[in-house]
Structures are given as C-alpha cells and as structure tokens.
Amino acid sequence: TEDIGKDVWEKLIMVAAIGSIMCYSNMPAKEVVKNKNYLNILKEMIIEMENASISINVNIKKNYSKNTLDYILGRADELHSSLKEDFDNKRPLEVDEILGEALRTGLKNNVNMPNCKKVYDELIKYA
C-alpha cells in the first residue's frame, strides 16, 4: 500500500487498545464490552491513540475510532490477544513496544492521553 504509516498505526491502535484493556481489566473481550467502565476506557484509548497518530500527520481513515469500536463490539466473543495470553501465562508484556509507542508519540506532540497513560502505568509493571 502507499501509506504504510497509516496501516501500521491502524493496526497498532487496534492491537494496543484491545490487548491492553483485556490485561488491565483481566477480562476477555466479551466481558470488557459488557462493563461500562472498561468499555469507556477502551473507547477513549482508541480516540487518544488516533489523535496521537494525527499529531504526526498520519492520514488515518475517517471515522476510524467509531469503526474500530464497532469492529470490537461485533467480534468481542472471538477476539484474541497475544498480550492477554502473555498476561495469563505470567510472561513479560510487550506493552512498552505497543501501547508505549503510541503514548510516547502523543505526549511528545501535546496530545492529552489520560486513559492510555493510566493503563500503561498499570501494565508496565508486568513488562
């Protein structure tokens, strides 16, 4: 594809958001989406990371956040996360390489990312 940055960011956001919230909540995706608090954190994380990508001029798809959340809601029963698998098996989490990358990008460019930061700060203990 022409815009590799866009594809990378769209995948990064999806993987970072769902994997991180599953670990943070210690729930499978299908439970996360039934929990108002965790679902809201998930939604906000997606928006925050989208804003981080926009801050470095990534031409992310219009309605990316909404479409990503809809995708997660529609497939919550079958969504799998290698991050959660590592968490469940007490293996070190690659949270710094995934969520951390988005968080650092946003913060460096003055993007407000309170939900990403809260989740990152909790999960980095397991890295």
Label every model-predicted segment:
Residues I4-K6, L79-H80:
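Short hydrophobic "helix-edge" motifs at membrane interfaces and signal-peptide entry regions
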Residues G5-V33, N37-E50:
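Active-site-proximal catalytic alpha-helix in oxidoreductases
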Residues K43-A127:
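NAD(P)-dependent Rossmann-like dehydrogenase/reductase catalytic/cofactor-binding core
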